[in-house]
Curated annotation (Swiss-Prot):
Superkingdom: Eukaryota
Binding locations of UDP: 26, 317, 505
Family, similarity comment: Belongs to the glycosyltransferase 3 family.
Organism of this sequence: Neurospora crassa (strain ATCC 24698 / 74-OR23-1A / CBS 708.71 / DSM 1257 / FGSC 987)
Keywords carried by this UniProt record: Allosteric enzyme, Glycogen biosynthesis, Glycosyltransferase, Phosphoprotein, Transferase
Reaction catalysis annotation: [(1->4)-alpha-D-glucosyl](n) + UDP-alpha-D-glucose = [(1->4)-alpha-D-glucosyl](n+1) + UDP + H(+)
Subunit structure, interactors included: Interacts with glucogenin gnn; the interaction is direct.
Activity regulation comment: Allosteric activation by glucose-6-phosphate, and phosphorylation by a cAMP-dependent kinase.
Name this protein carries in UniProt: Glycogen [starch] synthase
Length: 706
């Protein structure tokens, strides 16, 4: 945080430190954010970008290559801390972009813990109970980061320094940086609020009562008051406060008592998922693997046709209410009733992929796959025998001889072998609803909800259900598919979340060309709703969970799924094409520009004299541009003359100047494979809206001109 009595630092070639507890250590979603964003950030900053996190020896051993710092100021800072007994690993993170990382061994600083806890109380009035190991780790890590930043700016006196913190676990350093007047400018991004996650997990009408919560009392009742204090202090101590979505910004304004300066949506490394023209073939290949599982799981009751079978799924952390699993199961029951009433021949197999406590795979699940494998092996043997006999009979054929008959081709031995396999497929029980033995079967919320709505995989049911309480893996003996391959093989992802600050699962569906259902309480759902008119035409269905009652929302979700079952195969193929072409909307090359704007705003606030003293309000506010529905239904989104932006960071002037595809502001959707098939251009609806402080710096250059 800069001060007027100090010489302004050089902002043009500023340094960037990004601080999080998941650097080179997978715990949750922030790891995915940092890893997927790294190529874009390193391309912009090069060796001026360093990630800071706590050292996890196990993951660092395989993810980090140790190096000597080339920057003399950084080298001097690290040495000064090592001289005081602090363990530090500096090196290259072995991911795309190869960013530099600085990892602190927090265990080497635990001797300072009591001193630092006392100081934290004196500085920020934040209590810290002894028995909360996660908070203890956050405090030690926070003090090490503040120590490092203070030491570093004493060595580096020329260049401006930006420190960007993610989540409360990395946020302890923020009030310390402000109190000590360390000459860095800071950004804090909350990916979800502590209190929001706790409140939503209970039976609370969260969003309609946000302004009425006594936040201190609610945090105290849940035993997280000290954590909430850290999060709130971080939000109020930073120069620029951001969240990952507008819905989380609304939540943060009421729970953390500061209105965010802007929104930094999560992007994806679209190249990782890119399959170009192959994605339809990949869908077919992986769908066939899911067919194999379904044949085994439902053996003895497999009376539905693969071509009339649709695969729906939901996946994520096991948060029964927050992830909307309760609504998904209830909607499946209503969908089952509607399909049976309509006399539909379509069968829906719904998968729930959520890791829970299990002991082993069920005997029934293993037996089903073994029975089908035996049947397939037997049929292969018989098939080869028939082929050989047809060939031998044909070689000896003379004019006037009859064609080979069935009795000559299938031997009595073949018939006995086949009859044995068919008798082995007899089943006197219904196919199981879960693939594993659960640790607490009778207390599991998902299983109890399935039992309540009586979705027991009965032959008359048009909706079947499979709960797979384990992460997917190609090494799984029952469902041998990695998650990405499984998603490609399905037809529809359903994520009816009640609390979802962003939502990577529907975003991943989009870039893989799989339609999805989300809600307007998820960050991703809000983002796409603002960006696209009639988003369902592009394979993104948005359920209203904010203004509708629970029953109405369930009915809306049921209606979306029912409408999807009525689509023809050709309509589903066209919709997948449109969905996949939205990938560029979610690429970090576009989303990353919001991070650029946040950093520029932080520099302007810390070093206003470097920007000719212009006020934030003097800059052009944002313009929101919407992608309209496609003229052709079914069809594909395309663009002949207009520009599209993933956020509200392009001005009207820029969008009419015909900026190229490579320009960071404007972009075009990929061209059609057959441009002549659809003669109409994609039109954009433009509507001006209030800008955020981040919008004000869109045309800003470092010398203060526009």
């Amino acid at each position: 945080m800069a001060h007027d009595n100090r010489e302004p630092r050089e902002v043009k070639n500023h340094l960037l430190f990004e601080v999080a507890t998941e650097v080179a250590h997978r715990v949750g979603g922030i790891y995915s954010v940092l890893k997927s964003k790294a190529p874009v950030t390193t391309a912009e900053y090069g060796d001026r970008y360093t990630l800071i996190g706590p050292l996890n020896h196990q993951s660092a051993a395989v993810e980090v290559e140790e190096l000597e710092p080339s920057n003399p100021e950084l080298k001097a800072t690290i040495q000064a801390m090592r001289d005081r007994g602090i363990g530090i690993l500096y090196g290259r993170w072995l991911i795309e972009g190869a960013p530099r990382v600085l990892l602190f061994d927090t265990k080497t600083a635990y001797g300072y813990m009591n001193e630092w806890k006392t100081d934290l109380w004196n500085v920020a009035s934040i209590p810290s109970p002894d028995n909360d190991e996660e908070t203890n780790e956050a405090i030690v890590f926070g003090y090490l980061v503040a120590w490092f930043l203070g030491e570093f700016v004493c060595h580096e006196k020329r260049k401006a320094v930006i420190a960007h913190f993610h989540e409360w676990l990395a946020g302890v350093a923020l009030p310390l940086t402000k109190k000590r007047q360390i000459d860095v400018t800071t950004i804090f991004t909350t990916h979800a609020t502590l209190l929001g996650r706790y409140l939503c997990a209970g039976s609370v009408d969260f969003y309609n009562n946000l302004q009425w919560f006594d936040v201190d009392a609610e945090a105290g009742k849940r035993g997280i008051y000290h954590r909430y204090c850290i999060e709130r202090a971080a939000a109020h101590s930073c120069d620029v406060f951001t969240t990952v979505s507008h819905i989380t910004a609304y939540e943060s304004e009421h729970l953390l008592k500061r209105k965010p300066d802007g929104v930094l949506p999560n992007g994806l490394n679209v190249t990782k998922f890119s399959a170009m023209h192959e994605f339809q073939n990949l869908h077919q290949q992986n769908k066939e693997k899911i067919h194999d599982f379904v044949r085994g799981h439902f053996y003895g009751h497999y009376d539905f046709e693969p071509e009339n079978t649709l695969y729906f799924f939901t996946a994520g952390r096991y948060e029964f209410r927050n992830k909307g699993v309760d609504m998904f199961i209830e909607s499946l029951a209503r969908l089952n009733h509607r399909l049976k009433t309509a006399g539909s021949k379509t069968t829906v197999v719904a998968f729930i992929i959520m890791p829970a406590q299990t002991t082993s795979l069920t005997v029934e699940a293993l037996k089903g796959q073994a029975v089908i494998k035996s049947l397939r092996d037997t049929v292969d043997v018989i098939e080869r025998g028939i082929g050989r006999r047809i060939f031998e009979r044909s070689v000896k054929w003379h004019e006037g001889d009859p064609l080979p008959e069935e009795k000559e081709l299938i031997t009595s031995q073949d018939r006995v072998l086949l009859r044995r396999r068919l008798f082995a497929m007899k089943r006197h029980t219904l196919p199981p609803i879960v693939t594993h033995n659960m640790l607490n079967d009778h207390e599991d919320p998902i299983l109890n909800q399935i039992r309540r709505v009586q979705l027991f995989n009965h032959p008359s049911d048009r909706v079947k259900i499979v709960f797979h309480p384990e992460f997917l893996s190609s090494a799984n003996p029952v469902l041998p598919l990695d998650y990405d391959d499984f998603v490609r093989g399905t037809h529809l992802g359903v994520f009816a979340s009640y609390y979802e600050p962003w939502g990577y699962t529907p975003a991943e569906c989009t870039v893989m060309g799989v339609p999805s259902i989300t809600t307007n309480l998820s960050g991703f759902g809000c983002y796409m709703e603002e960006l696209i008119e009639n988003s369902s035409d592009y394979g993104i269905y948005i359920v209203d969970r904010r203004s509708k009652g629970v029953d109405d929302s369930v009915n809306q979700l049921t209606q979306y799924m029912f409408e999807f079952t009525q689509k023809s195969r050709r309509q589903r193929i066209n919709q997948r094409n449109r969905t996949e072409r939205l990938s560029d909307l979610l690429d970090w090359k576009r989303m990353g520009m919001e991070y650029v704007k946040a950093r520029q705003l932080a520099l302007r606030r810390a070093y206003p004299t470097s920007f000719n003293g212009e006020e934030e309000e003097d800059f052009i506010p944002g313009v929101e541009q919407k992608i309209s529905r496609p003229f052709s239904v079914p069809g594909s989104p395309r663009d002949r003359t207009g520009m599209m932006t993933p956020g509200d960071f392009a001005s009207l002037q820029e969008s009419h100047e015909g900026l190229s595809t490579e320009d960071y502001v404007a972009w075009k959707l990929p061209e059609e494979e057959d441009p002549e098939e659809y003669p109409f251009p994609l039109t954009l609806k433009q509507r001006t809206g209030p800008g955020s402080p981040l919008d004000s710096i869109q045309g800003l250059q470092l010398n203060g001109t526009r």
